[in-house]
Regions:
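N-terminal, positively charged/glycine-rich alpha-helical extensions of SAM-dependent methyltransferases
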Residues: 1-36
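Conserved alpha-helix/loop element of class I SAM-dependent methyltransferases that forms part
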Residues: 34-64
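A short SAM/SAH-binding and catalytic strip from SAM-dependent methyltransferases
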Residues: 132-148
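A short glycine-rich, Lys/Arg-flanked "PGG" loop and its adjoining helix->strand segment in the class I
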Residues: 148-163
Length: 233
């Protein structure tokens, strides 16, 4: 069972994480923004994994309205737009990442893609949908202090008869720590860990650059606790 935090505690976590992601934005941009700007100037450019795109094709996203929660620099949402999605909205807490998304949207030439800076738990009323598809991509759930509230946000955003699309890694991976050098990963954490992980060595998952960052918090949610919500039934 995932631990539940008060609204004040939850906001402290999400504010801290936002500050850490704001710091990470220029680090990420140094690795890929120029390349992505050039790539998105090409019609039909797509960054989505094949298995992710296969599932979205099964849903039938072409012409549908899509909200992407925690969209980062918008590359996945813009990929869907390039492949025929309808009006799209990307939402993320980090203003610098949203600025990168807006640059990519301009390069892609799409006028009906909007990016909004917002705490995911407090989405403004004028962006509350409903949408045909509400989606998150890999890594999002672990940043959510309170899953029940997060899935309630998803429920409110999704139109009746719409689709919720979640691409996520299995939480068992969070039980492991990477080994040193060529040493294998090793089991360290409980699958049922309740307290958050606290790290302050950056968020560069492109080049693996370590830097002193604001502390950021991630959370272990079991597979069962992630699948029990009504909007997923």
């Amino acid at each position: 069972m995932s631990k539940t935090y008060s609204r004040k505690q939850r906001r402290e976590f999400t504010d801290a994480n936002r500050e850490a992601w704001d710091e990470a934005a220029p680090v990420h941009a140094k690795s890929n923004q120029s390349r992505l700007l050039e790539a998105f100037s090409t019609p039909g450019y797509n960054t989505l994994d094949d298995h992710c795109l296969d599932r979205l094709n099964e849903i039938g996203f072409q012409g549908k309205s899509i909200a992407h929660l925690c969209c980062n620099n918008g590359r996945e949402l813009l990929s869907l737009k390039n492949l025929g999605a309808g009006p799209c909205v990307g939402l993320d807490a980090s203003a610098p990442f949203i600025a990168h998304a807006e640059e990519l949207a301009k390069a892609s030439g799409h006028s009906d893609v909007t990016f909004v800076t917002t705490d995911i738990y407090d989405i403004p009323a004028d962006r509350s949908g409903p949408y045909d598809i509400v989606m998150t991509t890999i890594g999002v759930l672990g940043w959510m202090p309170n899953l029940a509230e997060f899935f309630d946000v998803i429920r409110q955003l999704t139109r009746r008869g719409g689709h919720v699309f979640i691409e996520e890694s299995h939480p068992v991976l969070m039980m492991y720590e990477p080994g040193e050098g060529t040493d294998p990963s090793y089991l360290k954490h409980s699958y049922f860990k309740e307290d958050p992980w606290v790290e302050a060595d950056g968020l560069d998952y492109y080049q693996g650059e370590k830097y002193d960052s604001n502390p950021h918090y991630s959370f272990q949610h079991t597979l069962g606790s992630s699948l029990k919500y009504e909007c997923l039934r």
